[in-house]
């Protein structure tokens, strides 16, 4: 739902139920010209022969957790711009235990399982998975490989810059998902 940035911050700060996540902010990045800074400073992480760059800025209240999901992009980076976050990562071989849901309308690949508080009906399967737990602070960047499952838990006043890249060969490789 498109809303003003100041209103989004108010909603997040007053979010006592930890349910609001602000993401998919490409329009905001373009209107504020932050996108120029992202493009100028991503030379070290942008791959050669890139066909698509997707930048995003994520903010949420303390304790908010993103759904467990994976990306098909050739490269996925997250940069903590404020505060601290925690991540749970699982390798692609874990997919058979995660009841993956493929949403081709939004091009999202998620799991109904909450890796931070596993629901009882998924406990037996989730116990077969080994998750990598990572804590990150302001200024740290992390590369998340394609098809790796991840979920982010936001700390106090945390914000994240996200950089996602597709190359021409990556587009060919994921064409069965696109067509």
What is the predicted role of each segment?
Residues 1-141, 149-179:
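N-terminal accessory scaffold of Fe(II)-dependent oxygenases
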